[in-house]
Amino acid sequence: MKFFALFIYRPVATILLSVAITLCGILGFRMLPVAPLPQVDFPVIMVSASLPGASPETMASSVATPLERSLGRIAGVSEMTSSSSLGSTRIILQFDFDRDINGAARDVQAAINAAQSLLPSGMPSRPTYRKANPSDAPIMILTLTSDTYSQGELYDFASTQLAPTISQIDGVGDVDVGGSSLPAVRVGLNPQALFNQGVSLDDVRTAVSNANVRKPQGALEDGTHRWQIQTNDELKTAAEYQPLIIHYNNGGAVRLGDVATVTDSVQDVRNAGMTNAKPAILLMIRKLPEANIIQTVDSIRAKLPELQETIPAAIDLQIAQDRSPTIRASLEEVEQTLIISVALVILVVFLFLRSGRATIIPAVSVPVSLIGTFAAMYLCGFSLNNLSLMALTIATGFVVDDAIVVLENIARHLEAGMKPLQAALQGTREVGFTVLSMSLSLVAVFLPLLLMGGLPGRLLREFTVTLSVAIGISLLVSLTLTPMMCGWMLKASKPREQKRLRGFGRMLVALQQGYGKSLKWVLNHTRLVGVVLLGTIALNIWLYISIPKTFFPEQDTGVLMGGIQADQSISFQAMRGKLQDFMKIIRDDPAVDNVTGFTGGSRVNSGMMFITLKPRDERSETAQQIIDRLRVKLAKEPGANLFLMAVQDIRVGGRQSNASYQYTLLSDDLAALREWEPKIRKKLATLPELADVNSDQQDNGAEMNLVYDRDTMARLGIDVQAANSLLNNAFGQRQISTIYQPMNQYKVVMEVDPRYTQDISALEKMFVINNEGKAIPLSYFAKWQPANAPLSVNHQGLSAASTISFNLPTGKSLSDASAAIDRAMTQLGVPSTVRGSFAGTAQVFQETMNSQVILIIAAIATVYIVLGILYESYVHPLTILSTLPSAGVGALLALELFNAPFSLIALIGIMLLIGIVKKNAIMMVDFALEAQRHGNLTPQEAIFQACLLRFRPIMMTTLAALFGALPLVLSGGDGSELRHPLGITIVGGLVMSQLLTLYTTPVVYLFFDRLRLRFSRKPKQTVTE
């Protein structure tokens, strides 16, 4: 009583306290960062190593394995995967959430140093690492195009000037430059001319290397002067290499230009990048795992004018893709939804109270509670994201509940003729415990979520804490500001209604009277209601088991990623043509705004595409509908497949794949893995629950297998090293010398001119100079035949691995796909030597599925404990919790009706319903107990009176919560796929709960009261005590 009086009779102090809360909230709001979702990125580090010309199997055994053994000893590594292809190895380390990425980076560097002695000596550089996840979609893609400069020159500008500067921007984790390679002098050898001149490929390599040398020459001095010695020992351009003498034949000089075509070209000609059908260099920017995407993008944009000034005017620097516009648009949609929710909730209060003065009170208390929450969010290090803003939207219905309960009870006393200040004090005292019980039991629902580990726990933490803080501030405001405003603003007389609202008032009275009559009938037929309650419990279980489930709603971020997978024996020229063909098909789609892509590098038969869709208000289809439409057109392209997927804000795992979900096969027997992977992939491709099934197992590449006749080689005076050196010189794009320039270093690359390597007959033109100086054709001591060879070798941990990726067809859920895969694996009879498990997002979904039921039970148990403590009773909490089954049925039925799978967002809705619907029962039980103790009423009379007296506030609180959630259901635009499941769950649960709990709660109350009397030996003595 004294606590409430302190604020009611000191209005200035109460107002200033509320103003202080509001000002702190406004300040916190201005300083809060913006993000699509809470920070849930796993710390990921990528280790890269190269050995030019080495086969994938050689890279896996001699480079990947030693590094994996050393890196695997690092503490906190949750997953380690590697992929080895021609000349390169990439190892992805994913760490536990609580692992500091900078400390992990130091451990990674130490592990690389420890493995250095076990790595091949021919590696051109030490392995390097980056603090970025290569499987993440870039947050921004920049393109360089020019009609004047070559692709190599553009790549040089991008990698030498732009990429290092961008990498220094806060939040940037990696800048990957693609579409070409650094400039280089290329020496294209003519095998026939070499043979005619008696010059070996090693002779050319040695001559070029010796002609371009950068060594210190020293200085000359006399008594008074000093001269630095400088020579023309370096060759910089193709024109300078052309006249280089490499050999003498019969006294005549053989120059490099006589046996080769020397050009200013690029280091690797098997690279191509494009943007909207125009050749381009791509700068793909990824953020650090802990960085804020909006802040990072804004920092990059602010740097762009400076970057443009560092490159020539003839080079066009453009933003081809930017993830931030859709994120900003999504947050604007949520903010609008929040404002609409507040307006609807205030409208509900106005309709029920039919008083402008009374409506002003929640119209003030609700914003104070919501705005004050921003200060706590800032102190907790949170961000303004879809989930935290949705928490505030839902909180609108909660925070007004507290004000409604207090306001309605005070208004009831005023209508009875009590003076305003007395009514405020008396009314607040009566419902103070009710409001406290409602708020504490609601916060108790979220305690299990706060203790939840892994990605789901991290994802829901901001939502949970934000909502709990809003409820806490609302509790304070409803017991301080609300009664003070009631006492000083409301009048003792019954408010005069406007004519247009009298109809609503009469309808409410009629509803209350009708409810009273139906409740009497129900209380006389309690067994029927008991059967209905048991039926809802059984229906809950059946619906939960049968409803499709997924991890997180599929988002439409306005960005698609595409992975091209062509025949494993395809040439680079043909692959570049496939890239152009696919880009044309996609560019012609009316919903597409921009297309960029690249191919080449160590994997000739693959490519990547990044597609920016038009804004949501300029297209009628969702991203998935656009993918479905394009899938039909892309399937007509022969010789290659393009797999599209919508970029998601949450992506788990470091392995790059061509689809959203992964199923990984592991085995210590590589032969068994290669035997069973095609069988499993073909089986999964037939399942209707899966789409775009593909695999990263590339073991069917074309190979030319050379078999040396060692006896013949010995007789001819040729060793294996000379033969291997010949092949590397001819076909390996061998880097034979380095050109030093002020800003960068460039290579001299030697190989047989591509004009002479169009078919297998090129091998017949190769020869080796033996120890007697004679030219011996390769065909004299070697035989060759076509064979198959892997294009890549993948590991997970230290086991061989193949990952099958898949998307979900329209209308299918991740639970459908998971169950179908499990059935298929059982039907195939896969041996125990091959182990299958879900990876990435699918793995997190499996883990979440196993904990969902436990989480719901834990929430109910927590609420029971809190209510038991508050009521000092084992029974009354059960009465209150009896409202939950009907809410569960309503939520699950609503999801089924809207074809929405049960996701993590829907789980939040279920948890919220546990907190919302029990409020009705709390108000009934509180007043019934009060009537029994002080009104000398029987339990049936008490609960009947409580139901009628609390009918108006129950309807108000339920409709307030319903209207607060309704904008989530009806909202469109960016991010609506996240809001819809939450709104559908809450609205469906509230509607069903409101229809049933008004009748089931009093029946359950009477049932437990009779049960208590039956088992109580001395009820009278207990009452006396």
UniProtKB/Swiss-Prot annotation:
Transmembrane segments: 3-23, 333-353, 360-380, 387-407, 431-451, 469-489, 528-548, 853-873, 875-895, 897-917, 953-973, 984-1004
Keywords: Cell inner membrane, Cell membrane, Membrane, Transmembrane, Transmembrane helix, Transport
Upregulation: The mdtABC operon is transcriptionally activated by BaeR.
InterPro entries given in the database record: AcrB_DN_DC_subdom (IPR027463), Acrflvin-R (IPR001036), Multidrug-R_MdtC (IPR023931)
Annotated Pfam families: ACR_tran
Annotated organism of origin: Escherichia coli O9:H4 (strain HS)
Any one GO molecular-function label of the UniProt entry: xenobiotic transmembrane transporter activity
Name of this chain's protein: Multidrug resistance protein MdtC
UniProt gene name: mdtC
Membrane topology annotation: Multi-pass membrane protein
Family: Belongs to the resistance-nodulation-cell division (RND) (TC 2.A.6) family. MdtC subfamily.
Annotated PANTHER family: MULTIDRUG RESISTANCE PROTEIN MDTC (PTHR32063:SF34), PTHR32063
Cellular component terms per the entry's GO annotation: plasma membrane
Binding partners and assembly: Part of a tripartite efflux system composed of MdtA, MdtB and MdtC. MdtC forms a heteromultimer with MdtB.
Gene3D superfamilies documented for this protein: Multidrug efflux transporter AcrB pore domain, Multidrug efflux transporter AcrB pore domain like, Multidrug efflux transporter AcrB TolC docking domain, DN and DC subdomains, Multidrug efflux transporter AcrB transmembrane domain
Protein's job: The MdtABC tripartite complex confers resistance against novobiocin and deoxycholate.
Subcellular location per the Swiss-Prot or TrEMBL entry: Cell inner membrane
Annotated HAMAP family: MdtC (MF_01424)
Keyword Membrane: yes
